[in-house]
Amino acid sequence: MSPSAPEQKPQLQQQQQQQQQGSSSGDSSSGSVNDSKSVTPAPSATSSTSQSSTAPSTSSDDNLICRWNACNQKFPAPEALYEHICERHVGRKSTNNLNLTCQWNSCRTTTVKRDHITSHIRVHVPLKPHKCEFCGKSFKRPQDLKKHVKTHADDSVLVRPSQDPQGGLNYRPQPPKGPSSYYDHTGQMRTNAAAFAHQAGHPSGGYYAPQPSTNYGLYFNQPPINNARTEHLGYSAAAGGYDRKRTYDMVDDFFGSAKRRQIDPSSYAQIGRSLMPLHGNLSVPNGPMTATEQYMPQPAPAPVHAGPTPSQNPLAQQYYLPMPSARTQKDLIHIDTILGQMQDTIYENANHATAGVHIHHAENGFNGYRNTPSPPTSHRSPTGMHVGADGYQPVSAASMASPMTAISSTGTPAVTPPSSSMSYTSGHSPSPSSSAMSPQSRHGSTASVMYPTLPTSLPAVSQGFGHSATTTLGPSFDGSERRRYSGGMLQRARAGPLPLPHEDTSGASTPKASESALSVGSPSSESDVSDATREREEQYDRWLENMRVIETLREYVRGRLERKEFVEDNESPQSSHSDAMDVDPKSPQAPPRELGTPREGSSLYPILRMPGA
């Protein structure tokens, strides 16, 4: 631009002369004018550039002038201006000159604290002491820098993923191994980028919810955490300690009520009411249960087996969890005996609780209480109500099944004979071309499918749950279907009284004897579920929860007995005998008496020693 400045005046004169010429020379003059314009800037352009070069210095000087009321004092640096406003105009409460109203020009912003107004003053003062380590951009307030750094954290996730070979799903974040994962735009690593590792979106931070551990038999549920958390999960024990302590107290109260015989072990109603507060609070893992609840303070064991990602046991607290009702070995044995009686009572009420409810098996659940090598099968109740994966109780038998689903010793289903099983395709029509569950591939005879055979002699119910009854016969191949066929007619059970047998209009012959035994209902939509059926489902769910809680508590007590996690009774022999809580008034047989202990009845009354005796 500077070499063309001396030629500016002659070119302007030439331009004026060319504009005064005739039309014959107009084209050539316009070309020369265009050439002069293209290489030589206008006078206004040169003046504007010179003004723009001096504008920053002038504007910076104006920004360093105090505009608080009529102060107009000029400062050499933004730091000096900011300190002047805070000390001179805002003041302090200790010097009795605190001013909480901003008087910069016409701002008039009023705050309630001195820290607030000093932070507000940064808006007016060109002071930007907070500099970004990634891009070098400066900010006036620390919260502005904090928001800006989050954008760099998101960029680092997209550009440079985590170098952690474990996938970043650790429960506790590991210390940094070498350089951090934050990089600037030139690929250079920042040394202090680890200070922002907790901001958001970093995959190697490790702030994720723990997976359920399979190493503990009794632990309490924690709310699922599906998003990244900004705080360290190592401090979550204080937040969730209230719920764990509350559940722990409920278990202790239940043990105390059972020891004091406030719960009748032979009454299913009392057992159900006492176990109701524990429903949903105790968890049974899907793996082997070893009942390693940390009763005494010790660090959580580090598992080395292969399987799901282990995590810290919620019960593995680093402090002593007292349970007064289950402290000694005698207490644990007594509680285990009472729990066994309650479990037998719940078993005895299985027929009443599971009447009319189909026992649904999960894919990875237990297929019965008996550990036999027989194949898992699904069964149907007399009314044929099926509780499917999208029904009322999705996982009603995921971890524990009813005794009705037990497998007999011969390897066949105890409830349903194999000959009465049916299969059908996705079109809800019986077809010999069913692939996986075809009756032809399992039985080899169509007659055995169309005409189920009944056993010649049925055992009594008192022989156990492994035997079948007449009213419990039904198809067994109903893994994912919602309806069944009986006699070639689309039918479904309903909760009303047993209707009259319907005649088959499809032309297929129907065995009338099996029709009466299978309690056939009229066709209806799947949404037509009566209140009685829904009530039976809820009753079955309560029975199933009672079974789960009792089994969990028994394994917890047995685990403590096996590991000898109880307080040793080192007291005198007089205090080691059974007290009033351990006496069962309903038991006809007295507890065994040990040698050297007082006779029966002495524990009920104090022994007064006479002087000199």
UniProtKB/Swiss-Prot annotation:
Its main location: cytoplasm. GO terms for cellular component: cytoplasm; nucleus. Gene3D superfamilies: Classic Zinc Finger. One of its GO terms (molecular function) is DNA binding. Residues 442-460, 506-517 have a biased composition (Polar residues). It is found in: Cytoplasm; Nucleus. Activated by C-terminal proteolytic cleavage by signaling protease (probably palB/RIM13) at neutral to alkaline ambient pH. A motif (YPX[LI] motif 1) lies at residues 451-454. The keyword Oxidoreductase does not apply. Binds to DNA. This is pH-response transcription factor pacC/RIM101. The gene is PAC1.
